[in-house]
């Protein structure tokens, strides 16, 4: 990417979006409305692949949910951390993730959503209830307020918060993972050297309103299928003609 970086124009962003749309289509994914599930899924996804993440989440369901019912997060919080650790072992670094999951649940149970009325489970000495362990209030709350709340939870950053808001409720936020970051940087969408957390603000600023899901999913797909980390397939890239980084990897073995 050239040193003299300039914020991409709307026309350039739309050309990239349209070309990605030609290759990958428009993803269809209705918001699932389960923000706490999404939050825990994102924790489980850290340092592993989608398959291992999904197996770990399924194991959590088997341990802490009655068939056909949602996960009992109050029971998960009350359980010994070793039970959570055993359940999520297929997802890797289970000791770290199990402690983080319980810390997040404890924080939700013990803190109030911004502007919310008193929550029974948050009272001193009162065990958390299903209602206390809920993020449903975010459905109608200002996005910035919900994002700030999520990012204050233990181990939760902008990407995790964006996953919860976008995938659970379809709210205007956009996760920037390693694939989106890599593709966006090579295309010149991001300021070179920008801190990872800052990329979310840059991504939101350039994404056409209402197209957050499409842009995230298609950039991610392109990163996985073509714009690989070490050996991107530039010769086969649908975006090659509009990529300032094309040819930069030709000399690599």
Indicate where each model-derived feature is located.
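Catalytic cores of DNA base-excision repair glycosylases
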Residues: 2-252
């Amino acid at each position: 990417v050239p040193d003299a970086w300039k914020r991409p124009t709307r026309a350039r962003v739309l050309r990239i979006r349209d070309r990605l749309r030609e290759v990958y289509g428009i993803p269809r994914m209705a918001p699932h409305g389960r923000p706490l599930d999404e939050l825990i899924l994102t924790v489980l996804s850290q340092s592993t692949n989608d398959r291992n993440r999904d197996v770990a989440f399924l194991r959590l369901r088997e341990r802490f949910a009655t068939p056909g019912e949602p996960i009992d997060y109050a029971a998960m919080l009350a359980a010994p951390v070793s039970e959570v650790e055993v359940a999520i072992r297929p997802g890797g670094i289970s000791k770290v993730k199990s402690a983080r999951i319980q810390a997040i649940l404890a924080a939700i149970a013990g803190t109030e959503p911004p502007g919310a009325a008193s929550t029974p489970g948050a009272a001193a000495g009162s065990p958390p209830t299903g209602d206390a362990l809920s993020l449903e209030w975010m459905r109608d709350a200002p996005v910035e307020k919900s994002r700030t709340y999520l990012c204050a939870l233990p181990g939760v950053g902008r990407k995790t918060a964006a996953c919860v808001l976008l995938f659970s409720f379809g709210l205007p936020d956009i996760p920037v993972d390693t694939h989106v970051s890599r593709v966006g940087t090579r295309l010149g969408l991001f300021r070179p050297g920008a801190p990872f957390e800052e990329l979310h603000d840059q991504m939101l600023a350039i994404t056409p309103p209402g197209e957050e899901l499409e842009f995230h999913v298609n950039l991610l797909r392109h990163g996985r299928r073509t714009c690989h980390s070490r050996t991107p397939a530039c010769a086969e890239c649908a975006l090659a003609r509009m990529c300032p980084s094309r040819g930069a990897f030709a000399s690599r073995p």
